[in-house]
A protein has these predicted regions:
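A detector for small-residue-rich transmembrane helices and their helix-helix packing motifs
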Residues: 1-171
């Protein structure tokens, strides 16, 4: 199950070596929040097609929450170089805690290796990524104006678990 192991390793490496986490100080919390807003998918950003402004981050109000038309912004995005669509993929490798990461990787290992054997390496990787994107689009359908970052591999792993259920319904 090479791809399953690669996905598990990638999630762990991102969490341990790239994603800031840690202390309870305001500086630590601010650093973690800045990282998430800079790299994670945010429904409001996908809805509007551009990164959040500072006002949207601090107020939690999306400029086009109601979908009533084009966004009129009086300030520049807080992270102007952020690609809001690539952030969907980045979010699949970001996790909120050791527990979040641990359970996601446990379920990926238990179900992913079997699904990978059935779909093949390339098909499985494509399936994993597509189900992760579909999970984000589902979240977007329910909360298009949310300014909270959406993180975790749970959506992609739910897709893998669904495939397992279809392939082995009596397991």
């Amino acid at each position: 199950p090479y791809v399953t192991l690669l996905l598990i390793a990638a999630n762990i490496v991102v969490f341990v070596l790239i994603q800031p986490r840690g202390g309870d100080s305001l500086e630590d919390i601010d650093r973690e929040n800045r990282f998430l807003y800079e790299h994670a998918a945010v429904p409001c950003e996908i809805t509007t097609g551009s990164p959040l402004t500072f006002a949207e981050i601090t107020t939690g109000e999306c400029g086009d929450a109601a979908g009533a038309g084009p966004v009129i912004r009086s300030e520049e995005p807080f992270f102007p170089s952020k690609n809001v669509y690539l952030a969907i993929f980045a979010s699949m490798f970001l996790h909120g805690s050791w527990l979040h990461l641990g359970f996601n990787m446990l379920f990926l290992w238990v179900f992913g290796n079997n699904v990978e054997d059935r779909l093949g390496h390339v098909g499985y990787l494509a399936f994993y990524l597509v189900t992760g994107v579909m999970a984000m689009l589902t979240q977007l359908a329910f909360e298009p104006g949310s300014t909270a970052p959406v993180i975790g591999a749970s959506g992609a792993i739910a897709g893998v678990m669904g495939a397992y259920l279809i392939f082995w319904p009596h397991a």
